[in-house]
């Protein structure tokens, strides 16, 4: 599950669009504290810029002060869904939370933010017709990829003798949700530490059996 995707905005959007997790380095995630504000946002009678900071719930920063908006993907995804399930979602479907760069722009300047995220902001604006420099982005978790699926034994061999599956093709070494770049790490671990021994073991066994 990827927590930083563009939610459904209209009938012509066929899927949720994956954004970069790098956005959470500087963007602050929030929903309204008041349910009536969330309902007004869903109905389109209020804009996010109408809601003062005091009425914004930066729920990841509140729940996880040591990590803030940089919590692992599975934590960010579950927290966003929980807030939306509680009625605090912010787009017309109620299935979105805000990712706000106002604070980064105030702190760093728009030029710095543009240099870091300009291509992502352009993609967001092209899809949503909203300017993320002026109004908060909306994001929602989406299915990113299937975590494994091919059966392997403890030596990473499939049900077909001599055929091994490594990396994300077999299973996840990383628990509830993978961390950034862990696909590479899992492939390296399987390939470097496991396959040289398992393949040699299998080929020696096969030789003994006259195969």
Which residues are covered by each model-predicted region?
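An anion/pyrophosphate-binding glycine-rich loop and adjacent beta-alpha core
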Residues: 1-126, 197
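Short loop/turn motifs at secondary-structure junctions and domain boundaries
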Residues: 21-22, 140-144
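FAD-binding beta-loop-beta segment adjacent to the flavin cofactor pocket
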Residues: 145-164
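Short FAD-binding loop at a beta-strand-to-alpha-helix junction that anchors the flavin cofactor
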Residues: 159-177
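Conserved small/polar residues in nucleotide/adenosyl-binding loops
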Residues: 202-207
